[in-house]
Amino acid sequence: MKIKTRFAPSPTGYLHVGGARTALYSWLFARNHGGEFVLRIEDTDLERSTPEAIEAIMDGMNWLSLEWDEGPYYQTKRFDRYNAVIDQMLEEGTAYKCYCSKERLEALREEQMAKGEKPRYDGRCRHSHEHHADDEPCVVRFANPQEGSVVFDDQIRGPIEFSNQELDDLIIRRTDGSPTYNFCVVVDDWDMEITHVIRGEDHINNTPRQINILKALKAPVPVYAHVSMINGDDGKKLSKRHGAVSVMQYRDDGYLPEALLNYLVRLGWSHGDQEIFTREEMIKYFTLNAVSKSASAFNTDKLLWLNHHYINALPPEYVATHLQWHIEQENIDTRNGPQLADLVKLLGERCKTLKEMAQSCRYFYEDFAEFDADAAKKHLRPVARQPLEVVRDKLTAITDWTAENVHHAIQATADELEVGMGKVGMPLRVAVTGAGQSPALDVTVHAIGKTRSIERINKALAFIAERENQH
């Protein structure tokens, strides 16, 4: 049997992390079995579905490299097919027309609630032989079995059973002629030959209804697996107040797709004690029976730790391709300065996100207007003039501009003046970067370049002289 899974988002907003994890699990299961992964857009909610949301979902999928083998299919383009199946069910007697008014249904609901009963349709039109005009408004309901129960073996939760008496005669076509969500899903899974439906636990109550419709159509019933929800670190359902929940917001915040994927796969699934997984390892090891039944808590610190790991573990040239976007957001002109791959090597240890990296690298490429006030007050004092003049002259004398030779020049200055490295290094750092913190000074000065470094030291010396004149 060829394994076929699907990811079927409703395009009413962005791709959130819960949806992305469901997509990832479906994708991994298909890849693990050499099967196919289908993308289906469930856009039957015409009022809330937007083209922007469809684009945002695909952007998120593409950024995570969760490529689909079939689709995207759109439910709104399949209405003829759904209606043909409904007409067939009406003929076969597995569905019926219901003419009950909203007022009657509301009164029925209130009566049932008052008795403490679960509100459900009472089947009046199911057994009615009244004649109605062809143009009289009606809905179409599925004639749900009235006896027995529906049992399915959830691949994550084990056997789940629903009594048919608890299930309603579901509306499958509205008065305006449009088919309903639960019905469209069934026909899609049948037509697309989906073998495994992996989705959120909020769909568990839909499953028995969908199974009954599939059986009425004499269609194969797929295997179901319902993934638990994701909570924030406070135990409440993950939402915007916990920070980013959209996949592309994580991109904007400077996360690598590898870090988010690795984090999401471990959010409810495990393979021994392993924390770091390549894409190939995820595919190789992923099984549904290792997915947890209990809710997962989203931990941003853990994601940040993973991101820092991947910034340093992945090839710098690759990380640089993702960094480029963030550099553009900061409007930094990188034509004069180190290659971005070299920048990744320079700043990788210090920066946990690419956004942080882009925001802290400007001095490598552009001259700064002024020194950081606190750093200048502390380190650009008259006592720093001599160390800066001596180190400037030694840097000027370098013919082979390497980080090693820069280091020798700084060391030689400290030796000559008989002071600690900090007495040379700190003023030099503020002079060339404008700030009190940077990567190792030798590689920083080397990356900034000889001409620019010497110009900046002269600027710092002028700053010191100006301060002296003011006192």
From Swiss-Prot:
Protein name: Glutamate--tRNA ligase
Keyword presence, Aminoacyl-tRNA synthetase: yes
Quaternary structure (record): Monomer.
PROSITE patterns named among the record's database cross-references: AA_TRNA_LIGASE_I
Homology family: Belongs to the class-I aminoacyl-tRNA synthetase family. Glutamate--tRNA ligase type 1 subfamily.
MF annotations from Gene Ontology: ATP binding; glutamate-tRNA ligase activity; tRNA binding; zinc ion binding
UniProt function note: Catalyzes the attachment of glutamate to tRNA(Glu) in a two-step reaction: glutamate is first activated by ATP to form Glu-AMP and then transferred to the acceptor end of tRNA(Glu).
